[in-house]
Amino acid sequence: MATYLIGDVHGCYDELIALLHKVEFTPGKDTLWLTGDLVARGPGSLDVLRYVKSLGDSVRLVLGNHDLHLLAVFAGISRNKPKDRLTPLLEAPDADELLNWLRRQPLLQIDEEKKLVMAHAGITPQWDLQTAKECARDVEAVLSSDSYPFFLDAMYGDMPNNWSPELRGLGRLRFITNAFTRMRFCFPNGQLDMYSKESPEEAPAPLKPWFAIPGPVAEEYSIAFGHWASLEGKGTPEGIYALDTGCCWGGTLTCLRWEDKQYFVQPSNRHKDLGEGEAVAS
């Protein structure tokens, strides 16, 4: 029984299957954790969703910003951009089933026995774990309700960017969504910066990567995240695992076997012929 953590798949179905074959992943015996952004940019978003859904209890995933953007496109709120290569998924006969399943997936995964937490972008240092749990449930409840299109229409935006327990309504939900799915840099007090996408070495002062600012969750738990391909899986403190290594940009798909902390990589099948960018500013 092994636990495998894999970074952002982004529609790279062939690489995902090859990587799982490489590690001899066995559904029903092993567990697969996925950092989100299952879809967009790669050619196989439809196949990725079908496969991941078929794994049932053998998979634990979190939603990423591209997954939320797909839901917004499906709801008629956002435009389907050709570069995201989502049309086969949106036009599939089982699109309703797949996307209604997707919107019921969590923003946060926690394994208390392993002392392991996963979120797509990470955990803001302004939150303790109880706050993170409550905030995740707030957005998950709206996404799984009939009013989810209203939330998806309001989720786009960069403010508010500072956490307060007094936040209410759509502002609260937008902050939570940004913290879980778009965060990279923070100010020293933990306030989110939603504009900088550089590598940590190139970021303007006083910005720091979220994981470089002490927070209560990282004191007690390991944190696995994706989202930040330009990190190339490097430069994080002990106990912080950056797993997005840019497969859809011509990099690799990375897997971490949790029990012995061994890494496995699968090279991308694609040439790096696209400039890096995102369907949702992240």
UniProtKB/Swiss-Prot annotation:
Cross-referenced InterPro entries: ApaH, Calcineurin-like_PHP_ApaH, Metallo-depent_PP-like
Tell me which family the UniProt entry assigns to this protein: Belongs to the Ap4A hydrolase family.
| Gene3D superfamilies in the record | 3.60.21.10
Source taxon at top rank: Bacteria
Enzyme nomenclature, EC number = 3.6.1.41
Give the protein's recorded name.
Bis(5'-nucleosyl)-tetraphosphatase, symmetrical
Name its species. Escherichia fergusonii (strain ATCC 35469 / DSM 13698 / CCUG 18766 / IAM 14443 / JCM 21226 / LMG 7866 / NBRC 102419 / NCTC 12128 / CDC 0568-73)
Judged by the first EC level, this protein's enzyme class is: hydrolase
Q: What does this protein do?
A: Hydrolyzes diadenosine 5',5'''-P1,P4-tetraphosphate to yield ADP.
Name the keywords, alphabetized. Answer: Hydrolase
For this UniProt entry, the molecular function terms from Gene Ontology, in alphabetical order, are: bis(5'-nucleosyl)-tetraphosphatase (symmetrical) activity
Q: Which reaction does it catalyse?
A: P(1),P(4)-bis(5'-adenosyl) tetraphosphate + H2O = 2 ADP + 2 H(+)
Looking up NCBIfam families in the UniProt record yields:
apaH, PRK00166.1
Disulphides: none
PANTHER family (alphabetical):
CYTOCHROME C5, PTHR40942
